[in-house]
Amino acid sequence: MDELGIPVYKRGFPEHLLRGYEFTIDVGTKIESVGGRHDVTKIPEMNAYDIKQESIRTALWYNPIRNDGIVLPRVLDITLRGYDERRAVVESTRHKSFHTNDQWVQWMMKDSMDAQPLKVGLDDQSRNVAHSLHNCVVKIDSKKADTMSYHVEPIEDASKGCLHTRTMMWNHLVRIETFHTAQEVHILFKPTYDIVVHAERRDRSQPFRPGDQTLINFGRGQKVHMNHNSYDKMVEGLTHLVMRGKMPEVIRDDIASLDEICNRWIQSRHDPGEVKAYELCKILSTIGRKVLDREKEPEDEANLSIRFQEAIDNKFRQHDPERLKIFEHGNQRRDEDRFYILLMIAASDTFNTRVWWSNPYPCLRGTLIASETKLGDVYSMMRSWYDWSVRPTYTPYEKTREQEEYIYGRVNLFDFVAEPGIKIVHWEYRLNHSTREITYAQGNPCDLYPEDDDVIVTKFDDVAYGQMINEMINGGWNQEQFKMHKILKTEGNVLTIDFEKDAKLTTNEGVTMPEYFNKWIIAPMFNANVRIKHEEIAQRQSDDPMVKRTLSPITADPIELQRLTLARFYDIRPALRGQALSRQQAQSTYDEEISKKAGYAEVLKRRGIVQIPKKPCPTVTAQYTLERYALFIINYLQQHVARDCDEEAIYEHPKADHELEIFGESIVDISQVIVLVFDLIFERRRRVRDVYESRYIIARIREMRGKEKLNVIAEFFPTYGSLLNGLSGATVVQDIMYLNFLPLYFLVGDNMIYSHRQWSIPLLLYTHEVMVIPLEVGSYNDRCGLIAYLEYMVFFPSKAIRLSKLNEAHAKIAREMLKYYANTTVYDGGDNSNVVTTKQLLYETYLASLCGGFLDGIVWYLPITHPNKCIVAIEVSDERVPASVRAGRIRLRFPLSARHLKGVVIIQVDLGGRFTVYSEGIVSHRVCKKNLLKYMCDIILLKFSGHVFGNDEMLTKLLNV
């Protein structure tokens, strides 16, 4: 057949009369526009795709479960490329057979980040699959529905410099935490306590005595507030305090739900069947999120939640030994208290240590928060009232803390509701040296001993470091046991100090503040300065994460933020605001603020953007950020190879080279940056490889083990590979410096989970000597990905150290490092495909609300079998942009196999049901009227002159070649 008819009908036309047609368009079913824009808030009600109506940042982590299956818009492009690259194999029977690179095809499909969770209508009688658009409904025979996919686009706004073909790039940057803003960690009195002045003293030399209730400045029952004189006296250690549980209003309803479960349990005479662990866990998680919402939670949160539910079930069993002890007759306590005590024991056992407010798991911190509203300081009460103590098997043990009470808790400054002027406690964090004037000869070694008497300095513990090195030399790299915090001295250890735990209330001394309070701590190995101090709120809470809340905020520069390795001192969020589904809404001020950065126009000029918008589209910010980030990474790493240059010339470091010449593809993915680093620095190639090749190179390197991994590296990067192979004969420090490039292959990926969050990898650190340090790539102390690694690379040795001879220990260390990287699986903790790969539709829908509005369409591919095999794309869409533009966008879906797309048909339907048809390539069209009995509809006749279409199982065959 060389002609295809597509009926277009309105409401009232009997659909069963069109049963013989494989593709129909119902223009009578539509979603009314609002304000000239498609009403995308109706998407959850449509037979379209699975996006929930919720906060945009919450939507990023939504697992689409209300769908009928996931499709890949580019599956034909991938499989056709695989078909094109078939290899002929002569079998034993002398017959020739063809085989595709199945490994590549499967990887490409798994690696696709634009999967669509379709939510369609299914008609059992007609066997049709219905896809809703805002202006019509498209129905297709189920036999041919496997190539259907949505084609939605946000309309560009010229005033914002939009380039919406880069939406995927924006999606990618958010996934690798490079399109984020930050707020410094904020600490305040726990809202679960009323803190009351019980007694006072005139100076700290006068101890508090049991039973003493002497008051000097305050009346009986005076509560301590941070903006009150009572707080100042407390900080000075002049007040003795008592704590009582208090109910924060934000969780009142949730605590009431817990009380209902508790009351049922009590009334049933402690029947464990009344304690529904799943229901409890949901409520406790809600409490944990409301009080301290980190938005992004640990990947293993679901598994831990299951373990917590099991611990609850075990602890409430009537014959559990600890439960029996808590219910001893001599213990005259309330059953309500026992209920929360048992929950806290279950939470502590699940985490295998004491639970704090800063706990990353919402169900566990929610348990602590809920228990504090009833019991005050929970662990102190458990020890004094119930004789329960933390177990010796807990890590860390923290038994000594049971004699103390803790009044401060961490909250998220993004969500903290407070008026300007309110006093808070917060961490400041800035780079120790943003840039330095250096020469190649002197290098930029890390100065471990800064001269400043007024600061605390984080220092290496020489004994602990020596023990680690001996263990490494004798037994290889121990990724599970080697930790950075273990080789630092206790004083000023920025990986272990914790104000929430270090500021405490004791019986004899009142509140004691840690020695480091209000003092700068210089951590030279992290290039970091941190200080905790009192500060004031400067701005009210906002859904815009870019709003800086304090008078001394953390940096807003996207590249400088990549340099702040110590994640424990700040919180991050994607620079997005508003709802996932909205017709029109304000965007974050992030993009506008970033556009004010020095060099902004210079960086964008490299991308061909000359006219700089005042309020840029996020796609402009994404291009700026990745381009500048790439230049910074290259600048950092160029310092680690031998160079021919004026060794005494003074230059600023680090500093991105905006004049660096590179060619080829535009950089749209961090994988291209990583591959370019090796191509440019080692192979002297300035051409940027395309995104698919770059991602595949990294995937191939990761999947190999041992010698095969090194062979694959050498296959793609021969010069670098030869340097690694020559490591066994290394004689000077420069010979082993190339090892520090290896983490680039393993640290970053937008659908990657680390095998373990606390595993460490080895890295060379250049100080007055060459050291090796454990880098915990996914720990709670560090940011993930390259952010955990990059700032260590700002340090590089002087020429004298580069050329100094290796000692025996360094040579052995280098061999062990190479052995570790050849076999590491630190990146191989699985993936989160259902969540991560299905967000492209979300980004496009959300971006439409920030820019010019929303376009939707659905694409079907018709296979041509004669005279040449090819395909024709047929799209049904709205009429809001020219059909030729839509056709061009469809061609962009075929970057790998464009030669197979020989024709495009665009059927555009407006809100009134009127339609127009556009065709190009091997297909032409005409529109006719068709009478069926007393009914009339339109028929779009598509003519494929000289070509025959068919082959319903085209995709099935391609996937099985």
Curated annotation (Swiss-Prot):
A single Gene Ontology CC term: viral inner capsid
A GO BP entry: clathrin-dependent endocytosis of virus by host cell
Highest taxon in the source lineage: Viruses
GO molecular function: structural molecule activity
Short name of any one Pfam family annotated for the protein: Orbi_VP2
Subcellular location: Virion
Entry's family note: Belongs to the orbivirus VP2 family.
Functional note: The VP2 protein is one of the two proteins (with VP5) which constitute the virus particle outer capsid. It is the major target of the host immunogenic response. Responsible for viral attachment to target host cell, probably by binding to sialic acid. This attachment induces virion internalization predominantly through clathrin-dependent endocytosis.
Protein name, per record: Outer capsid protein VP2
Lineage of origin: Viruses, Riboviria, Orthornavirae, Duplornaviricota, Resentoviricetes
